[in-house]
Regions:
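Catalytic machinery of carbohydrate-active enzymes
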Residues: 1-262
Length: 262
């Protein structure tokens, strides 16, 4: 299977057993970059090509059969994954599989080195890509305090932008903390999540990664549409304030829901 994606997502497919060629689409290269990308892709005549981006590239790809994704307007009642799988319904009625990230022994050894003998780890994702999606750090601290009897250590994950939040968290929280925010790539992050007992975070990619490595998670939504964009899986819990004000959600309230689950 050949895939077109951006540079950030490439590493996720690094160990995928089905991957043929990963074509990077770099928006910074402009029209020249798109032209070069198309020239490379058009060297292959595909049996099937599927559009999940609506960026027009599918019209220029050589393929015996082309399938386009359904519009947002026609699928407002569906989860985003269900919407995307509708694109291939004409060729398969197979159920939507559980999300998965392929991790190698290298990443597994990395996670063992970082975590050592620590078990019962609570992983936290303190950041997101928009302020309206970010739960205050102090609320995460209250959550961790409320759950301290269930977990031996807190693992902080996220991007370089989240490192400042990690520093604040460590000043406020008195328990054991392993800070990896801004220090790992996506596969290393996935491996660390796989060694954790539970993940709690904002509406960000980390919640989806938690589902993809098979651990239970709790996503705290501010603005956003959890019915469409929550992590997939029976063990993926979520909560959203009715008024979409994430800051007023109490740490103890989320902790109580998690304790009922675990």
């Amino acid at each position: 299977i050949d895939i077109i994606g951006d540079t950030r997502s490439k590493i996720i497919f690094q160990h995928c057993p089905y991957l043929g060629i990963f074509y990077e689409k770099d928006k910074k290269l402009g029209l020249a970059g798109i032209y070069s990308l198309l020239m490379n892709i058009r060297k292959t005549h595909y049996e099937l090509a599927v559009d999940l981006r609506s960026d027009g590239l599918l019209y220029f790809i050589k393929a015996k059969k082309k399938l386009f994704k359904h519009s947002n307007q026609s699928t407002l009642n569906l989860h985003s994954a269900e919407r995307h799988f509708l694109a291939i319904k004409k060729v398969t009625n197979a159920p939507i599989p559980n999300p998965k990230i392929w991790i190698s022994e290298k990443e597994r050894l990395f996670s063992k080195k970082v975590l050592g003998k620590q078990k019962n780890i609570l992983a936290l994702g303190l950041g997101a890509n928009f302020d309206g999606k970010i739960w205050p750090v102090s609320n995460f601290v209250d959550l961790a305090d409320s759950l301290s009897g269930f977990f031996e250590a807190v693992l902080l994950l996220g991007s370089h932008q989240d490192a400042k939040k990690s520093s604040i968290f460590m000043k406020l929280y008195s328990g054991k903390v392993i800070d990896c925010a801004g220090q790992t790539n996506l596969l290393e992050t996935a491996a660390l999540l796989g060694k954790s007992k539970f993940f709690v975070g904002n509406d960000s990619g980390l919640g989806h990664m938690a589902s993809a490595v098979g651990i239970p998670s709790f996503t705290i939504f501010g603005v956003g549409e959890p019915n469409r964009y929550r992590p997939l899986g029976k063990e993926a819990l979520w909560y959203q304030d009715p008024g979409f004000n994430i800051s007023i959600i109490k740490g103890a309230h989320i902790a109580a829901k998690i304790i009922q689950w675990i």
